[in-house]
């Protein structure tokens, strides 16, 4: 592993070497790191308030980051475990995962208020197990775009995220994988919104599926303003349609064209 203060000049890093940082100072990491199991891994230790950024894959792929973790089981196991000082996560661009690659990665990161995007559409055994467990600062989960579950993939993923009140998924069945969502939403916010495809059976309400007092919404077409603006639907020619709009996905009002 190597570190740099400017992203240009690099020096070899020795595990357990503390790197002091004054406010505003940065340190970059790159290398060929990978954890290999629950007894063989490394974790960052932080004090103060630390914001991470950039591509996490440079820690394992060095100067040629890829989007695959194939063959790297447990690669980032517990990498930020217990980092209460962490206020922002790095980018996690991997689209090909490995077994338990992100297991317990952010466990107990109570200062984390926004989860990184998780773009992978195909899951591996235990890949996100306990990933955000006890991240009490999170209110929204990252979108989960995979349509098929894997054994233990989301097990206890958000367990103890007491502020979590929003989750959007793409999978259409709870079955076919062992304990894939076991206790994944245990001890989260008592009320919240669960967005899912219409095919997903949400009749069973518990911490391993959908919390009992959460609202279930269809994955409706949605526009989000990234800066101040507006949206309207303009009619051309002679068409008729009944359209409704909502700002929360729950309460709906009739819409008039060109409004």
Question: What residues fall within each predicted segment?
Answer:
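Solvent-exposed loop and capping/linker segments of extracellular ligand-binding repeat ectodomains
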Residues: 1-259
